Amino acid sequence: MARMSFLSFLLFCLTSVAHGNKANKHKPWIETEYQGIVMENDNTVLLNPPLFALDKDAPLHYAGEICGFRVHNGPGGSGSAQFEAVVLDRSTGEGLVRSKEPLDCESQKEHSFTIQAYDCGEGPDGTNSKKSHKATVHVRVNDVNEFSPVFVERRYEASVPEGRLFDRIVRVEAVDADCSPQYSQICFYDIITPNVPFTIDNDGNIKNTEPLDSKRQRVHSFWVTAFDCGKNRAQADAQVIVTVKPSCKPGWIGWTKRIEYTPGSGSIPLFPNLHLETCEETVWNIQATVELQTSHIGKGCDRDSYSDRSVRRLCGAVRGEVDLLPPPSPATNWTAALPTLPSSDSSLVFSFNGSTHVAVVPDSVASAVSGDHFTLQLWMRRGGASTQPPANQARGTRKEEETIVCSTVKNDDSYSHYSLSVHGCRLSLFYWPDVSAARPVKFLWKLEQVCDSEWHHLSLSVQFPSVTLYVDGVTFDPALIHDNGAIPNPAPHQRLVIGACWEPEEKPKDIVNNTMPENKDTGKFVSGYKGLLSGVTVRPGNVEPHSVVECLYACREGLDFGDLETLGSGMKVHVNPSQSVLVLEGDDIESFNRAVQQVTYRNSLRFATPGVRPLKLTTSLRCFSEESCLSLRQLEGYLVVLQPDAPQISLSGVGPHLARPAAEFEGPQGVPLFPELRIVCSLSHAVNTAAQGMEGGALMSDAVAHTLDGCEVQPLGEELNTEREELLVDMESLRERGLDIINTTAYIAITGAESISVYEDVLRSIHYRLAKGSARFERRFRLSCSEMNGRYTSNELTLEVNFLHSLDSLYHPSHLLASQQQFLHPSHHTGELSGHTLPNPHRNSVVPGAATVIIMVCVGFLVVMVILGVFRIRSIHRRGEGARGGGKEGGNQWDDSALTIIVNPMETYENRMGITTDMEGECEDEEEVVDSPDDTSDDQRIIIKKEGRDSAPRRY
């Protein structure tokens, strides 16, 4: 019974499971929205996300499988007609959407419809099938570049006047039927006809690349094509016809872009053939601006290449200036910490950063420039070496006050204070005659030169209460301000600072003792200067006259006007102080054209700085009818200053040998080294000074052509030994001429701009002196000179000095034995004749007979003659010079060779014995024998000093 119950229960469970497999409990699930893309030439839609239907009844057969998708119409009502969805895998539910027919992007770019998934139900017949929710599908049809561009017109025509450049002559247009921006847009046009003076841009605008000439070609015909962004070319090209109409050519005629200037030419016209054509347009005002750019030449323009001190001498400036920023040295170490920059004119340029770069001048130097009458001069450039002028030339944007020089000096029993500062585009001098009593006075100038980031020279002449400012040699008047505000008194301590101002620390007063604390120099630097400074000098005493200041620092090149008397009525000419901008203004065309042809460029330097100076001409016209008034473009060119002819400085009239007895060199004045020196400059000095265009121009041009600025005398080989030799120079004569000298054992350098004749006199006065007893046999010197701050150098003149020693000077009687049995011992002179070979000291102690002595003397004389001849032949081959002089007995006189003969003291021995002979003629027939130096029978010894070949490096 129990067994039957168990079988019944098992049968019931199997029946229940069978009924459970056929149940379809869940409906499929898909995404709510799909984005699709389909190409025009394809029917498969790429969906994002991919089409997958999921069913929770999986993995049941039928109920967990996806049997299909249904497409329903969207808002447009065309979804089911154009698209279908198929199942790719029933178990995973993957599906695919595709179009039933080819799609056309140009007809419809986007399609929207809904899609629904359904499962397989409970059996193969799909009983009890369930459907998912409806998902929206958006399909975008991607374009294919199937269409080519088509021009709107097949032919385009335009007419333009000749002689002008146009921004647009005619515009061509092409369209593309593709639907997408990528293929429907025209990316570029192209002129396919070669060698036509036209160009076309991407928008189809055609313009000419050069002025058209109707006489050369009246009609221009060419073809253009178009390309879409898919690089499809137009189906048919378009023809463009441009007709050139004869017309007037308004503008400047005769413009030359390149102008050459030869140094030394004076003034040359820049536009000798230039004239303005207005084509009968009524013009009531014409203004032309000529700009010459020289800011890249030196410090703002072409100036003298000499040192500041030399230029001051040439211009006749008063001496006595004190250099506040000298080159760093052990004696002038207050500038050692300042960074320096290279300069084209070899001057020293110091950089200041507004904080740490400050120069404190020692009190010993500051006390030398005290007083209320002084001249302060300096080169200044705001902002540093890398700063460029602002493009918009905005002024006054910098509000920080920057102090250039700040000085408190003691005058007798009081202290005076002044400071030179820049504030934006303003330059101010703050002067306090007496810091303990008087109130300060402020002199103010508003200058564009202060804030244009260019090099400018400032010269401030103070004769309190009168102050005069020169900027690049041009005078500027100040605005006087009596400042009675609450300004603290400067500390009564002498201090001169460059690049900032010293602000002492305030100390509280001791109320109990009613005293001030102990005076300690504590404080800080304030109002630091940011920029470059060079040549900062102060000269106490009377100020320089205007002509000297202009000669010192005015530009030597610039624009000028030829003849103001020929200027027509109604014409105006204005030239800026630096002569880099010239403005012409008038109302008459003919007068204006004549005036333009009078604009000149001048450069008063004989050795002008070569290079390019950009040139611009800007024209502004005003007409009665502003709408039709002509507009002229800016003309640009350049002026080329050619390389000047290098002067050939020739030194002659010296040597190459100078032979004198050693006794003359040992005299108190020594011997002049260059008594017949001649200095010649081969360059022609004809300078056109008729139209220099400025005061002092002719003077400088003439002075430059005949001026040297340095010569150097250098001993070759070893340096001078001050204990045995020296070069003597007339220091008083140098001071009178204002020349400087550097006198060392390695060289003597004389510097300063002076005429050739002055340098000849100075060099001729140089003497060479030996100390008594100096056994020197030769010394070589080299002389060279330079011009234009070392820019041009002379030839190197080498002089060999030979010292002729007598027998007594070489062999003092004390060196000989009283006995006639021994000759000179060489050890007595080895110290003096270092480097020379002396004979073997061993001698025969037996006194020879008279005949033997005579024979030995004759033979020795012949040996001397033979050896001299051999060495003369070697000297001829070595130097390439012919020997001068004869060779007869004791009357022989040799040329200045580096050869010294020392005769054996046998001759002295004979004189002391009273022996004479007349047998010299017989000795001439004797055999000529040259024995070895070691032979004990030698009676004559020859000591030879060869010419030295070492030389020191050249400083010129």
From Swiss-Prot:
Residues 921-956 are annotated as: Disordered. It comes from the Eukaryota. Residues 1-20 form the signal peptide. Residues 872-956 are cytoplasmic. Residues 30-151, 152-271 form the Cadherin domain. Residues 921-937 have a biased composition (Acidic residues). Keywords: Calcium, Cell adhesion, Cell membrane, Endoplasmic reticulum, Glycoprotein, Golgi apparatus, Membrane, Postsynaptic cell membrane, Repeat, Signal, Synapse, Transmembrane, Transmembrane helix. Homooligomer and heterooligomer; mediates both homophilic and heterophilc interactions with clstn1 and clstn2 paralogs via cadherin domains. Interacts (via cadherin domains) with both alpha and beta isoforms of neurexins. The cytoplasmic domain binds synaptic Ca(2+). This is Calsyntenin-3. It comes from Danio rerio.
